């Protein structure tokens, strides 16, 4: 009887240990966000927006909700990031395999402690900002982010050349072709990381709605314990036309719970397809207040264009500027 009891106890111990191991390997995370937005220089029923990705509604609106399922084995793993809501539909162009619900879905293999292969769809390596608002300081998005890729479908290899230097090489479908490519064309991506600064290159043919060539620098510096300066700059060319821009992200932490930051961005168009070579100065001031897993972000944004009048003021007259106040709430789990 004692032997039987010991055997059962041993099996139960193994089961509990295996269960604990599985719980550590499998994780669920995600976020939910919503916002309120009102224009300061125009009527809320004017039907206009800044012209950047996401958060383009007035009044109360849903951003997105996403759930990330991750399984990490000893050397292999998989990630599925499911998303819904207007921000999710915009990020996947609502033309996904399952009607815009798959943000990311990929498998990976840690070939060694210095080499990782990733196969599937993954969010872009270009730019300072990302799709999920929980990972951005500003709630609204920049022009640089809005005009670059959101995601890539393909194969990439990440190499840790040292503790502070990395290299990524990628072969993908053309710009934001998230599921099936009907053109038979491919894009190439390269990222060189150097002490927290990243030089990114992307190129496709530019035809069939492709992006063409883009070079991007993304980085930042901790100037003091409480002051961080983020930097993003990019140049795009597609058959002689494209965009350019630069953005600074100074952010100051005033306490453990509150930070304030500015995004100052200059963005412009160039080339034969843009004869007026319009440009915009976009200033966004954002506060960030943290309550446990909830982030509350009040934000004021002003965009002012040169050689373009894309907005309508409160009198219904075309104008070159638009300002808005936004209050967003983001919960992460």
Can you describe what each PLM-predicted range is?
Residues 55-86:
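Glycine- and aromatic-enriched membrane insertion/assembly motifs of diderm outer-membrane
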Residues 30, 34, 62-71, 105-109, ...:
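Residues on the lipid-exposed face of transmembrane beta-strands in outer-membrane beta-barrel proteins
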Residues 20-36:
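Short N-terminal segments immediately surrounding and downstream of signal-peptide cleavage
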Residues 34, 71-73, 82-84, 111, ...:
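Short beta-strand segments enriched in hydrophobic/aromatic residues
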Residues 35-59, 88-104, 112-193, 199-203:
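Surface-exposed coil loops of outer-membrane beta-barrel proteins
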Residues 21-23, 72-76, 112-114, 162-164, ...:
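Outer-membrane beta-barrel channels and translocator barrels
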Residues 50-55, 88-98, 196-199, 207-333:
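Outer-membrane beta-barrel pore domains
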Residues 1-25:
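Cleavable N-terminal export/targeting peptides
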